[in-house]
Amino acid sequence: MRAFYKNNNGLIAIEDWIPNCWTNIECPTETEKRYLLEELQIPEAFYSDIEDIDERPRIEIENGWTLIIMRIPVKSNDVKLPFHTIPVGIVFKGEVCITISFHKTEMLSDFVTYTKRKNIDIKDNFDLVLKLLLSSSVWFLKYLKQVNQKIKLAEDNLEKSIKNEELQALLQIEKCLVFFMTSLKGNDILLHRIKNIKSQREHFDLDLLEDVEIEL
C-alpha cells in the first residue's frame, strides 16, 4: 500500500508524489518495489535490509541517501505469541522521504491521525524520525499493558493447573517482553547515534528530543 502526505498543520493525504512529501509504503508489492528502486532510486541494499525481519535499529548513509531503521511493536495473529516487533525503515535524500514496512501496522496510520488532530508540523526528515520514535514508545507502552494482563492470566491458570500447556503458554507470552526490551534498547542506541550527528545538532527540537529520551 502506497500513500503520500504533505505537511500542513498535520499530515494531509494527497493523491500523488510532490517534492518534500512523506511517502509511506506498507507491505510493498512488486510494482511498489520497482517504484522505490527505479523511480525514486533508493539503494536496493536499503530495501533488502528493511525487509529482514531481524534487522536491528541503526543509521546508515550511502551515496547521499540516509537509512534509519527503528523497531516498532505490532500485534500478531499467533494466539500463543500475541505481540512481536518489526523493522520500519525511513529512507531520505533531498526532496524524497519514504517510510517502508513489510507488515501492516496500527502505529503509522494512528500517527497520521494524531498529527492532524493535534495540528503537529513535521519540520524535516529527522523531526519525522524523532516523532515516529516517540510514537513507537507510546505503542510499546500500550501493548506492554496488554502483555502484562496476559501474563497475569497465564500465571493464574498455572496456579490452578500443573499441565505443561499452561507453563508453555506463560513462557510464550513472556517472549513478548524479551522482544520489546531488545527493540527498545536498540531504539535507544539509535536515538543517541542520531543525537551525535554534528550536522543536525542545531536543528533538533530539544523539547522533542528530551521527550523521546524520557519515553525510551
Where are these regions (language model features)?
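Peripheral, non-transmembrane regulatory/ligand-interaction domains of membrane transport proteins
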Residues: 1-215
